[in-house]
């Protein structure tokens, strides 16, 4: 959706230009010595690939990747899974029916059912955080949990992945394609927007409007009118149930993920990222009261975004979000996940905090 800088996958003919753009971005981030080291690392990796391909042409893809990258296979596989999920979403969008009122009503029912399932999940009671507690830093990292889980990113610290060129380029590609962000200035502008305005303000406008026409310019085309009508109907359906502040999870969760991505790419320092996550943490704790409510907020905002995009594959998107949130709240059968369960939400603060 153009509203969030979310564009379709680049055509094959643009691959070379994209690769050059990634090099230019990295050139803006690193000094000459680091760029030389990066170029040397990439050259050595390319040499390894060419040599191994020549020696192992008879191997299958999985065996060849394992031979080439050894213990780095896990993070590379994560990148491939992310790309596969994006491809599946694009295929579903191509096969999905046109966006109409019937589909809209189905999505409302799906959202209500999914949010009810999230509400029924067990979660530890919120606990007090001291103002100078390390718990806030951990909480800030975990606010990126849904997108991190979908992308198989680490939630152990600020870094989302291991610092190897293939993953740095993959993250830069995600941020550029999904958000239209290519550097520090654009990153900070978007984080400011999400933390100060975002969908909280947008949803408020939709709730207050008496008709979709109040949201449009006089010369708006038919597509813009349909988009405004979908957003307005969404807000009118839910405005008595959810106040604008309920959108905080959707805004804060994405801002936290952008903060970690930006730090990973070197666009902001770790100290700057920690400060941004602190501010986002305070906003989340003020507006929401549990990880379940945070997850519900993310689903709520996610559907509004898909309605604005006119994406008929919105149901699949809600499924990805719900699965990620469930894994974070209760964990998986293999005992992984459960990061939100293991770090309870901050209890309401006393006066004088």
Q: Where do the model's predicted regions map?
A:
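Polar/charged low-complexity regulatory segments
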Residues: 6-270, 279-353
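Cysteine-rich micro-motifs
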Residues: 1
């Amino acid at each position: 959706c153009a509203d969030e800088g979310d564009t379709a996958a680049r055509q094959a003919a643009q691959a070379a230009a994209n690769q050059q753009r990634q090099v230019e971005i990295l050139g803006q981030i690193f000094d000459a010595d680091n760029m030389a080291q990066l170029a040397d690392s990439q050259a050595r990796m390319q040499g390894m690939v060419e040599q191994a391909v020549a020696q192992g042409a008879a191997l299958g893809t999985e065996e060849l990747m394992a031979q080439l990258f050894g213990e780095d296979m896990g993070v590379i596989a994560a990148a491939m899974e992310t790309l596969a999920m994006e491809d599946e979403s694009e295929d579903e969008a191509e096969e999905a029916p046109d966006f109409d009122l019937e589909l809209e009503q189905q999505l409302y029912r799906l959202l209500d059912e999914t949010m009810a399932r999230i509400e029924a999940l067990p979660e530890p009671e919120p606990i007090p955080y001291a103002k100078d507690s390390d718990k806030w830093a951990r909480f800030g990292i975990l606010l990126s949990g849904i997108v991190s889980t979908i992308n198989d990113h680490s939630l152990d610290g600020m870094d989302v992945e291991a610092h190897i060129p293939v993953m740095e380029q993959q993250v830069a590609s995600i941020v550029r394609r999904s958000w239209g962000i290519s550097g520090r200035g654009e990153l900070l502008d978007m984080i400011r927007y999400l933390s100060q305005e975002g969908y909280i303000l947008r949803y408020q406008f939709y709730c207050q409007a008496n008709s979709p026409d109040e949201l449009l310019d006089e010369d708006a085309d038919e597509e813009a009118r349909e988009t405004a009508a979908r957003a307005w109907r969404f807000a009118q359906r839910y405005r008595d149930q959810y106040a604008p502040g309920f959108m905080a999870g959707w805004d804060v969760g994405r801002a936290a993920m952008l903060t970690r991505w930006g730090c990973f790419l070197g666009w902001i320092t770790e100290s700057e990222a920690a400060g941004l996550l602190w501010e986002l943490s305070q906003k989340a704790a003020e507006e929401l009261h549990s990880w379940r409510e945070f997850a519900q907020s993310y689903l709520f905002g996610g559907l509004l975004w898909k309605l604005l995009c006119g994406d008929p594959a919105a149901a699949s998107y809600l499924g990805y979000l719900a699965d990620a949130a469930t894994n974070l709240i209760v964990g998986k059968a293999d005992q992984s996940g459960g990061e939100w369960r293991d770090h309870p939400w901050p209890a309401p603060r006393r006066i004088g905090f």
